[in-house]
Regions:
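N-terminal cap/lid segment of alpha/beta-hydrolase-fold proteins
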Residues: 7-46, 50
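Mature extracytoplasmic enzyme cores
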Residues: 23-24, 28, 36, 107-109, ...
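Loop/turn elements at helix/coil->beta-strand transitions in domains of secreted/extracellular proteins
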Residues: 34, 47-49, 103-106, 146-149, ...
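A catalytic-pocket lid/entrance helix-loop region that shapes and gates access to the active site
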Residues: 73-76, 128, 153, 160-198
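Alpha/beta-hydrolase fold nucleophile elbow
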Residues: 144-157
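N-terminal cap/lid subdomain of alpha/beta-hydrolase-fold enzymes
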Residues: 38-105, 110-113, 124, 167
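Alpha/beta-hydrolase active-site loop
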Residues: 91-92, 102, 124-144
């Protein structure tokens, strides 16, 4: 394992488990606040397509640690999910970098404003959060390791925010894989038939 200490960029980089991992990379938003991201990429030089997620669950919280019951049920019912991966980097409802990085993708996992390692006030599904995801997409597109093609992939919360940010039409958003995500949270989530669901 090789680790480079945080330097001028303010984040640490290490080679681990066949990946180059950048921890707590700052991504500056249009209002000056810096969100934090973990970037998992193939080792060596080269440009790769990006799979990005941004959400409130904590980018560094392992699936099995934060959601043990759901994790155990998933790997019991579908053992192929855990095959070929240590599951150390698998987080709730996001892609597992140990499966995607060997296929030539960069996985960028961003903590939403006010969540995990990102400062600020958490305001779920707000216009501010949606703009933050837009800026994270555009940031990822221009990094030296990126082809400029950024896709979004995730379940539930990570799917719903895909629909919201897509409405802003980020120039470098080229793909979405939204699983189990309401496209209209008013009708599908909070007010079925116009009646508040509690």
């Amino acid at each position: 394992m090789f680790m480079k200490d945080a330097g001028m960029n303010g984040f640490k980089t290490e080679q681990r488990d066949g990946m180059c991992i950048d921890w707590d990379v700052p991504i500056r938003m249009d209002d000056g606040l810096e969100l934090r991201a973990d970037v998992f990429r193939p080792p060596g030089e080269g440009r790769h397509p990006v799979i990005l997620t941004c959400g409130p669950y904590g980018k560094g919280l392992a699936f099995q640690d934060g959601f043990g019951f759901a994790y155990n049920k998933l790997v019991t019912d579908f053992p192929e999910v855990a095959a070929g991966t240590s599951q150390k980097y698998q987080c709730w409802e996001t892609v597992d970098p140990e499966k995607w990085v060997p296929e030539g993708y960069v996985c960028v996992r961003v903590d939403s404003r006010g969540a995990g390692r990102s400062p600020g006030f958490m305001d779920l599904f707000s216009p501010r959060e949606v703009r933050d995801i837009y800026h994270a997409i555009e940031w990822a597109a221009v990094q030296g390791w990126s082809t400029g093609k950024v896709g979004l992939c995730g379940i539930s919360y990570y799917a719903m925010n895909q629909w919201l940010v897509a409405s802003l039409q980020p120039p470098h958003l080229t793909a979405m894989c939204a699983w189990e995500g309401a496209a209209d949270s008013y009708r599908e989530w909070s007010r079925h038939g116009g009646i508040l669901c509690t």
